[in-house]
């Protein structure tokens, strides 16, 4: 279920700042048609930090509704307070999701034991599969491989999204974690190499606008056809990098609007529109990727 090309989906807004459910449905259909393997709803790229609890739950539920069982939906449920993460899990438990993606607690910098206890508490509240999410560049805490290995022994903790960009960890996680534990890259620029080293897929920002190419690349890689996959990856490499020229999801939301995938490219403060100097840089990356 959790492998291949998984999109970290953007959350579209109307000009007055409300969630744009018409564009959201269009995005879901776009990914179904492109062969995307799963959708992460309301993760970091989906601006989870600026949605209310009610909006968060509704966006996930509507994404499940729009998918109509055509691909699995994974709900972002991270929080820096364990009780809040548990509450999200409870609220989303009956929405039809296939799993939770739970980022490490941010800002308060827990110890490794604190991380273990945090995720253990979440796992005890649900039978739905939990995907760990390690992104120290955003959270200021790094979940070490030893902690991931301990957590992998918990029945419904089934996968890790590793956005460290440290490819040496693939082998460490593969060696230390229980058999069958899924490793997913959270870094587009190194995602293909991650799979080559033993990962099972990528949770991708690039996928928002290059869904068919990302799906084809990941499926080739999982079939062991790395030379063919590398050709696609090389064409997308500038895009992988330039979608982070400003804080994500600022560039990818601008690109999605430019391509007509969403009706409006606005974000919620404190995130702002892509700056004027950055726009031609992202536009050039779209051109080099041959997707617009």
Swiss-Prot record:
Where along the sequence does the record put site: Part of a proton relay during catalysis? 44, 107
What keywords are annotated for this sequence in UniProt? Amino-acid biosynthesis, Cytoplasm, Diaminopimelate biosynthesis, Lyase, Lysine biosynthesis, Schiff base
* Main location, first listed in the record: cytoplasm
Q: Name one GO molecular function term.
A: 4-hydroxy-tetrahydrodipicolinate synthase activity
EC numbers on record: 4.3.3.7
The entry marks the following residues as binding pyruvate, namely 45, 203
Give the protein's biological function: Catalyzes the condensation of (S)-aspartate-beta-semialdehyde [(S)-ASA] and pyruvate to 4-hydroxy-tetrahydrodipicolinate (HTPA).
Q: What is this protein called?
A: 4-hydroxy-tetrahydrodipicolinate synthase
Organism for this UniProt entry: Vibrio cholerae serotype O1 (strain ATCC 39315 / El Tor Inaba N16961)
- Underlying gene: dapA
């Amino acid at each position: 279920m959790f492998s291949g090309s998984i999109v970290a989906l953007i959350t579209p807004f109307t000009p007055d700042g409300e969630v744009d459910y018409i564009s959201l449905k269009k995005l879901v259909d776009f990914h179904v048609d492109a062969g995307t393997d799963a959708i992460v709803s309301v993760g970091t790229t989906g601006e989870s930090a600026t949605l209310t609890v009610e909006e968060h739950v509704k966006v996930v539920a509507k994404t499940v509704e729009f998918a109509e069982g055509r691909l699995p939906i994974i709900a972002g449920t991270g929080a820096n307070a364990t009780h809040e993460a548990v509450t999200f899990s409870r609220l989303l438990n009956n929405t039809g999701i296939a799993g939770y993606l739970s980022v490490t607690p941010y800002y308060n910098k827990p110890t490794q034991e604190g991380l273990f206890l945090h995720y253990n508490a979440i796992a005890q509240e649900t039978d739905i599969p939990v995907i760990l999410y390690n992104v120290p560049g955003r959270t200021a805490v790094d979940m070490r491989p030893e902690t991931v290995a301990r957590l992998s022994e918990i029945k419904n903790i089934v996968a890790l999204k590793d956005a460290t960009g440290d490819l040496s960890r693939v082998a460490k996680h593969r060696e230390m974690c229980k058999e069958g534990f899924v490793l997913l890259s959270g870094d587009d620029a190194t995602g293909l190499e991650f799979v080559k080293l033993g990962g099972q897929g990528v949770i991708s920002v690039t996928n928002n606008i290059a869904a068919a190419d990302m799906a084809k690349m990941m499926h080739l890689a999982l079939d062991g056809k790395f030379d063919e996959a590398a050709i696609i990856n090389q064409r997308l490499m500038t895009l992988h990098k330039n979608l982070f020229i400003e804080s994500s999801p600022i560039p990818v939301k601008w690109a999605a609007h430019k391509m007509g995938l969403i009706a409006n490219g606005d974000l919620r403060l404190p995130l702002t529109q892509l700056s004027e100097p950055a726009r031609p840089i992202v536009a050039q990356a779209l051109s080099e990727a041959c997707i617009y």
